[in-house]
Curated annotation (Swiss-Prot):
InterPro entries, per database record: ARM-like, ARM-type_fold, DAD_dom, FH2_Formin, FH2_Formin_sf, FH3_dom, Formin_Homology, GBD/FH3_dom
Domain (GBD/FH3): residue spans on this chain: 40-416
The protein's role, per its UniProt record: Key regulator of the Wnt signaling pathway, which is required for various processes during development, such as dorsal patterning, determination of left/right symmetry or myelination in the central nervous system. Acts downstream of Wnt ligands and upstream of beta-catenin (CTNNB1). Required for canonical Wnt signaling pathway during patterning in the dorsal spinal cord by promoting the aggregation of Disheveled (Dvl) complexes, thereby clustering and formation of Wnt receptor signalosomes and potentiating Wnt activity.
Record protein name field: Disheveled-associated activator of morphogenesis 2
Domain DAD, chain residue ranges per copy: 1016-1048
Written domain comment of the UniProt record: The DAD domain regulates activation via an autoinhibitory interaction with the GBD/FH3 domain. This autoinhibition is released upon competitive binding of an activated GTPase. The release of DAD allows the FH2 domain to then nucleate and elongate nonbranched actin filaments.
Tissue localization of expression: Expressed in most tissues examined. Expressed in kidney glomeruli.
Gene behind the chain: DAAM2
GO molecular function: actin binding; small GTPase binding
One protein family per Pfam: Drf_GBD
Record-listed Phosphoserine modification sites: 1015
Annotated source species: Homo sapiens
Amino acid sequence: MAPRKRSHHGLGFLCCFGGSDIPEINLRDNHPLQFMEFSSPIPNAEELNIRFAELVDELDLTDKNREAMFALPPEKKWQIYCSKKKEQEDPNKLATSWPDYYIDRINSMAAMQSLYAFDEEETEMRNQVVEDLKTALRTQPMRFVTRFIELEGLTCLLNFLRSMDHATCESRIHTSLIGCIKALMNNSQGRAHVLAQPEAISTIAQSLRTENSKTKVAVLEILGAVCLVPGGHKKVLQAMLHYQVYAAERTRFQTLLNELDRSLGRYRDEVNLKTAIMSFINAVLNAGAGEDNLEFRLHLRYEFLMLGIQPVIDKLRQHENAILDKHLDFFEMVRNEDDLELARRFDMVHIDTKSASQMFELIHKKLKYTEAYPCLLSVLHHCLQMPYKRNGGYFQQWQLLDRILQQIVLQDERGVDPDLAPLENFNVKNIVNMLINENEVKQWRDQAEKFRKEHMELVSRLERKERECETKTLEKEEMMRTLNKMKDKLARESQELRQARGQVAELVAQLSELSTGPVSSPPPPGGPLTLSSSMTTNDLPPPPPPLPFACCPPPPPPPLPPGGPPTPPGAPPCLGMGLPLPQDPYPSSDVPLRKKRVPQPSHPLKSFNWVKLNEERVPGTVWNEIDDMQVFRILDLEDFEKMFSAYQRHQKELGSTEDIYLASRKVKELSVIDGRRAQNCIILLSKLKLSNEEIRQAILKMDEQEDLAKDMLEQLLKFIPEKSDIDLLEEHKHEIERMARADRFLYEMSRIDHYQQRLQALFFKKKFQERLAEAKPKVEAILLASRELVRSKRLRQMLEVILAIGNFMNKGQRGGAYGFRVASLNKIADTKSSIDRNISLLHYLIMILEKHFPDILNMPSELQHLPEAAKVNLAELEKEVGNLRRGLRAVEVELEYQRRQVREPSDKFVPVMSDFITVSSFSFSELEDQLNEARDKFAKALMHFGEHDSKMQPDEFFGIFDTFLQAFSEARQDLEAMRRRKEEEERRARMEAMLKEQRERERWQRQRKVLAAGSSLEEGGEFDDLVSALRSGEVFDKDLCKLKRSRKRSGSQALEVTRERAINRLNY
């Protein structure tokens, strides 16, 4: 069952809670209303309403009070206004009409209270000052309260309360100071200021430590009323915690229970104090978190019950005071209702919270078959092990356990504590989250890691398939576009061929007519031959179709080695030119070179990358005089083998037997590649995540499955095995299993025929479309921008306007111009107006265009490709096109070579690259045609603007127009901003005039009503009403009635249940 939410309908009559009934205005006595005569006559209605509205604004009234005030007749309004003005102008009150006077006096009183012993007259005067301040805070206009707050008047009062001595604490001054704070809180602005002060409520609570019952009553009324204000309940609980420390209480609220049980001897004072205490207890129990939180009410009420409040309540019944009995009834009724609610949760009629055995049985019954039951047993088991001494030395451990349980019950899901008494900064939710089973967390973590790896693998496979699909799709689309273009080109060439055949037929017919005519003189020797008359058009063979790309000649055969076979007798001389062979510059010798007996190392060594001299070139050189065999006798070959061994060893001294054993078990790796290069190669292979065989198959199949990304191919090109690397690796190919990873990779790649050329062709294929897509927009930008500049009519019209303005402005040699260089366009903005330096000639040009030639303003829409063309560097573009041309040529050469070779079954270089060359050659030829056309159009554009004699590049030429268009657009924005600023200033001026007129009209139109007549304005306020309702118990009237009705219903139901149980027992 959900906890019962408590509401305070009894507060409906209060102004601060929006009561619905407007009280009547009653006179204090039975005398008739006497009008006061004033020297000044009553002004007209409009002026009276304006003056009266100013007065009402000063009084800080509620909406209903304002309505009642404005509903008064004009004579009454004028009487109230004149009386208030007369009070403000009273010369006897000028000194005390401002808060500065009171603040200075109270500060001096606080400073001198411990220095002097004041007599009775001086004490009375000091008390009168505080009383006057209390009255001023209630009766003075709103500006007085505002000024008091601004001058830190509240801080002055709080400091006085903190520093007062015992004599002052027991005097009427203390009561009056609390009254000043209460009067300040009777104002909405003052109340907000008090609640905003962090230590204000705690300082007020400190005043409970006095023997003056009136002071205690005033403090309790303030604290009880603050409980009912939004956000005040928690501040009051914190204030009572502060008072526990301040007054050295054993438990919180101990002083209140002592005062509730103590007898003062004076009936009136005793009843007032006990009523204030009970009203405060009911407010703190049922307001704030107690409105809808059953656990909070049970928790806080249990604190009072443990202090012994129930016997005290029974004792208070003897006073037979109606208001006090109302508070006692409300306390007991709410307690009984909450106990019933708690019992319903356990399907019980009543729970004896004083019986440990009954509470344990209920908890045992509730948790017996739940997962929490082992935890209950653990709690009890560890409670048995808690330290125990007869003298109670371990009370704090049990207190800690109690407070932890209180915190668990009270703290909500957001971690908010309605009461800070149990444990501060103790977040139950965070601790519960930390107590989750670690094994379960580890299990989920392992499973999540497994799923993560599977997910990453699937994502990787999906990405490869997507790349493969995307590549195939792009190739298919490009092939279809190329096929369509080739069809169109074939149709055009067929048309041209038919036209050419028709022209040939006509020419043949003409030749036939000429041959049948008069015989002409024979042609001169060596003249052109004529076609025979029998030759017709059909006899002409058709021209061969154009090849998609030029075939390259086979590579030249390698040159013969120097010691090749001699030329056979009768063979033509070398080079086919009849020239004798050149003599060998190295003379041969008939003395054979001695055979070298080089010592063999015990294991492979690193190689020395030298270029070996041929033996036939040694005679006659210094090498013929050198004998390296003598050096071997001097060298320490064993040390040399250790230093330059091809096996990689760790630089570690093998001193102990364990080191020798571990070293012997390590696998020796053979590495002949440079260390830095090998390390970079290993890093690349780790990024590829492919085996050597997978990389090899991907290269042979031209990366069908898109395993090799473009950036990886670019990196692989940096690790092409060089000839020296291949020679070294070939020497140790019998030890391939011992090779380091980088060495083995380079060795296996070197076994692929034309590995470097294949890799370059594959990389070119992957990058071709991207490079083509980068080059085409640049070519098209130049082409389209050139066309747009030449064809733009609006640009031509604007140049006419600029030429006219320039000829009008310039005289002498600069005047009378027929045209100007295009670079002059960007100098228009440099000419500033003589009247306004913010206006340039460009701004004025736009004004002219807006007024006389508005269509020219749309000129940028005709020149949309200028920004792109201004970024194109023609030299770099032509260089890129040349690189593409050379790349295609290199692929064609490699394709011709691979066609002559015997291929492996998995080698797909020829079919893949043949299709690629077919499509890419056509696309590239189209790009070249576009580039040639763009050059022509650009040259025409230069000539069109008279710049044909200059050597402007496209980026410079188009950049001039692009810069001008940007400046043109910015100038238009500047003009638009100037217009908006001007319009905004005019609109603001109109709005200010309208607002001023509206304020004047509203000042006399506001008609309100008030709760009492003008004379009652000095008495009471909304905070006083709240305190009064709390004191009388009217705050709880609605809830009390509801509880009584609920109690009757529940009592009758309980009676019926008891009867049924008795009958069942008898039947049984």
